[in-house]
């Protein structure tokens, strides 16, 4: 039986990417897509790549009707106040906002400067990162999709922390280089072409909100790493490259790292280990992931003076796919018992 779905907040880049995927999904029928500002307009007037793919028009949020599964793509702070209404509309909700990603309401105060209106529901929401929470997703009623930067960082580092290889007495430093689509579809001074073109601009050198998710997921045996996350805007539309600098407890070899990552991700359909001896694609590169749901992970060991060893881990995704819409569809497939890769097989383009 075909599953009926709707998208709440479908006029942004994430909503458009989600609609693109769902329109080609063989087990899904998209019933409605909402937009308050564009109600009554054909969706292809906002998402021109979908011309002749659908005759759907945007409807106002108040016009939403019950469906089997609801995707919520609202800005931060707009989902939590209406969560009861969403759960009335659908027995399964997949939320792409940040409103239910964190389990601790105090973390919202610290990182978002926001008092969560429904702290009673935080423990019920499942963090929708399949590689870490697949079994929880299978039975979840409310799935909170991770942020794009946090997805990239967590997938790159989780196997190392879970294996106990990292010295938690030393700081972990991560920088994410991000494309412009991560800022959303609304124009502003920073996205004006003369200001954005050719840029390498520090966006959030410290205090990025996605740090909270990374700390939550990398806390092992009650111990939270001393991790700092910096985000830099670069000349690209799609993609994130996270580069993490860590210090192992004991010296590691490439073979050790291959074993750890293969044990964690060897059966994962959307994780690829990229560590080549030669060629221009020796390490993860976001450009070749555009439009795909893959996360590519690689590393390099750096022998420092004095006998200390530094581990550099690189992970890359398409922020609109594995960092948002693709991951949401992957979670939907798991939750509904479909093959996990259904509708997500596109490998990306090369060259691009």
From Swiss-Prot:
Task: Kindly report the protein's main subcellular placement as a broad class.
Answer: cytoplasm
Q: What is its EC number?
A: 1.2.1.103
Q: Which SUPFAM superfamilies match?
A: Glyceraldehyde-3-phosphate dehydrogenase-like, C-terminal domain (SSF55347), NAD(P)-binding Rossmann-fold domains (SSF51735)
Pathway terms, separated by semicolons:
Amino-acid biosynthesis; L-lysine biosynthesis via AAA pathway; L-lysine from L-alpha-aminoadipate (Thermus route): step 3/5
Q: Can you name one GO molecular function term for this protein? A: N-acetyl-gamma-aminoadipyl-phosphate reductase activity
Which residues participate in NADP(+) binding? 11-14, 319
* Catalytic residues identified in the record: 148
Which keywords fit this entry according to its UniProt record? Answer: Amino-acid biosynthesis, Cytoplasm, Lysine biosynthesis, NADP, Oxidoreductase
Cell compartment(s), UniProt: Cytoplasm
PROSITE patterns according to UniProt: ARGC (PS01224)
Enumerate the catalysed reactions. Answer: [amino-group carrier protein]-C-terminal-N-(1-carboxy-5-oxopentan-1-yl)-L-glutamine + phosphate + NADP(+) = [amino-group carrier protein]-C-terminal-N-(1-carboxy-5-phosphooxy-5-oxopentan-1-yl)-L-glutamine + NADPH + H(+)
Q: Which GO terms describe its biological process?
A: L-arginine biosynthetic process; lysine biosynthetic process via aminoadipic acid
Q: Is Nucleotidyltransferase found in the keyword set?
A: no
Cite a GO CC annotation: cytoplasm
Q: Which Pfam families match?
A: Semialdhyde_dh, Semialdhyde_dhC_1
Task of the protein:
Catalyzes the NADPH-dependent reduction of [LysW]-aminoadipate 6-phosphate to yield [LysW]-aminoadipate 6-semialdehyde.
Q: Which family does it belong to?
A: Belongs to the NAGSA dehydrogenase family. Type 1 subfamily. LysY sub-subfamily.
Protein name as it appears in the record = Putative [LysW]-L-2-aminoadipate 6-phosphate reductase
What organism is the protein native to? Thermomicrobium roseum (strain ATCC 27502 / DSM 5159 / P-2)
Q: What is the lineage of its organism?
A: Bacteria, Pseudomonadati, Thermomicrobiota, Thermomicrobia, Thermomicrobiales
